[in-house]
Amino acid sequence: MQSSAARPTDDFDFAVDLRGIPVDTSNPVMVTGATGYLGSWITKGLLDAGVTVHAAVRDPRNTSKVAHLNRIAEQAPGTLHLFAGDLLRPGSYDQAMEGCSIVIHTASPFIRAVADPQRDLVAPALQGTRNVLAGVERTPSVTRVVLTSSIAAMYGDAVDIRRYPGRIVTETCWNTTSSL
């Protein structure tokens, strides 16, 4: 499914500002789900900060999916390396992790038409995170792991959002109406 979400090269006022956050630019940083919404912005922030990014994507040969990352890399001081990675295949991130000091895990299934939420979303997200963390255990250079999530984990059928001040969802909010 092609996402219509804004990408970092689109005309959109959003940025990942890494100023003040200690990032060792001498070691690569791996980003899973680098073609996704959050992964793309994190990749852009790292490249803008001069970091070498090992971007794990489903298929680095799919030029339509990685074109925006290549455009960002052309204009940033950092260096981009694309790697194939499959959330559900153990060991598929090992090559991308090699030599990295930080792993930022943003990859997760995001499907709008879900037939079986446990099978289609929860199980692959858990297995994918386990696979990434198992890779970290095998990679001595990794000293930090950042796990991310999405508004999709908290925002279900929009009932909960009505009670939040200004209908703004923050880290203090939790989805109490959705279920599997």
Give residue spans per PLM region:
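N-terminal Rossmann NAD(P)H-binding glycine-rich loop of SDR-like oxidoreductase domains
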Residues: 22-56
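Short, well-ordered alpha-helices that flank and scaffold nucleotide-derived cofactor binding pockets
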Residues: 44, 48, 71, 134, ...
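Conserved Rossmann-fold NAD(P)-dependent oxidoreductase catalytic core, especially the SDR/UDP-sugar
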Residues: 105, 109, 114-180
